[in-house]
Amino acid sequence: MFACDELLLNASTIDATGLQLSNQAIVIRKGRIEWCGSEDQLPAHFQESAKSRKDCHGQLITPGLIDCHTHLVYAGHRAAEFRLKLQGVSYADIAKSGGGILSTVQMTRDASEEELVDQSLPRLLALKNEGVTTVEIKSGYGLDLQNELKMLRVARQLGEVAGIRVKTTFLGAHAVGPEFKGNSQAYVDFLCNEMLPAAKNMDLVDAVDVFCESIAFSIRQAEQIFQAAKDLNLPIKCHAEQLSNMGASSLAARYGALSCDHLEFLDENGALNMVKANTVAVLLPGAFYFLKEKQKPPVDLLRQVGVGMAIATDSNPGSSPTTSLLLMMSMACQFFSMSIPEVLSAVTYQASRALGMEKDIGSIEAGKIADLVLWSIKDSAALCYYFAYPLPHQTMVAGEWVS
């Protein structure tokens, strides 16, 4: 009979739906969960063979948290724009004066890879400090071949330096590259024919995203990009129905999207198509708050038809300058009227589904990677009750406790 590496006893945990369980035991072996369940059903040989035991004293253990939608690789900031917005200056006027997303594009292009790592690493470490063990990072502030690849390389490097799992998403279709101003179709053609294949060939991309909106890319252009991704066997995601209902969610679902994100203007048809495709709804309360949006995502509709809901930070310099997934959890309860179990599932199991990783992470189940967080609380509601607190007591990544 083999020995287990770690035995966690007398823990409270949550299941994949976010419901709390008491008196639980977790057996860790070779970086994975070997066994988990009620402590009174723990096989005796695990008790006898464990190399290390930890009595959790009823404290909560969750899966490692997952931030499944971020843009945290970028240079500079847009605090000066925030000051202007508070003075009543419109986004259109800010953009005309050289601000907006293209200002971040310019600063990101001007930064070296080393500078991008130096500026972005603190944001990733802030997430890690809150018990996040997997982070999705999008490109989208390069908008040309050289700089999109640079961003993706930096994202990969950040995961290695920070010691947590990073999944990369190619978001060249975030805005039209400035060199293609006035000719968005030429940019989309270049993206599909040159940029995306290069990222794939260099093994820098895990998924492909498109911002489908009247101010960004059309339904036809989004479909062209989705087809290019499909031809390269890359899964897709979509910034969909954030500012209007364009039918992007239905299109993305037709291509088997892992997730559709934002979704403030999602309708029933789009939601039903997402259910059929097992597409997750990623809700982003940070952007809702920072942009002072009035239209909430239709949580009741998503709940009614059975669309899984994830929560993420949307960490970015323009519309959600945050690195606190814990704060987003509280906001999801308060702004979107999500229940505590829904929110706990949203940053664990549902977030893993949004990355196509539910077979390996996102829940405490035998066979899954041992990404776990031990909290200094006993009631899971406290994770949503507090604002960005408490911080983890200990975090485990692939079976190893990390600092």
Curated annotation (Swiss-Prot):
**Intracellular or extracellular location(s):** Cytoplasm
Residues the record lists as binding N-formimidoyl-L-glutamate? 141, 316, 318
* Class in the EC hierarchy, top level: hydrolase
The GO terms this record gives for MF are: imidazolonepropionase activity; iron ion binding; zinc ion binding
Binding residues annotated for Fe(3+), in chain numbering: 69, 71, 239, 314
Record GO biological process: L-histidine catabolic process to glutamate and formamide; L-histidine catabolic process to glutamate and formate
Q: How is the cofactor bound?
A: Binds 1 zinc or iron ion per subunit.
Q: Which residues does 4-imidazolone-5-propanoate bind?
A: 78, 141, 174, 242, 319
Could you name the domain of life of the organism this protein comes from? Answer: Bacteria
Q: What does this protein do?
A: Catalyzes the hydrolytic cleavage of the carbon-nitrogen bond in imidazolone-5-propanoate to yield N-formimidoyl-L-glutamate. It is the third step in the universal histidine degradation pathway.
NCBIfam families reported for this sequence: hutI
Record-given protein name: Imidazolonepropionase
Q: Which organism is it from?
A: Legionella pneumophila (strain Paris)
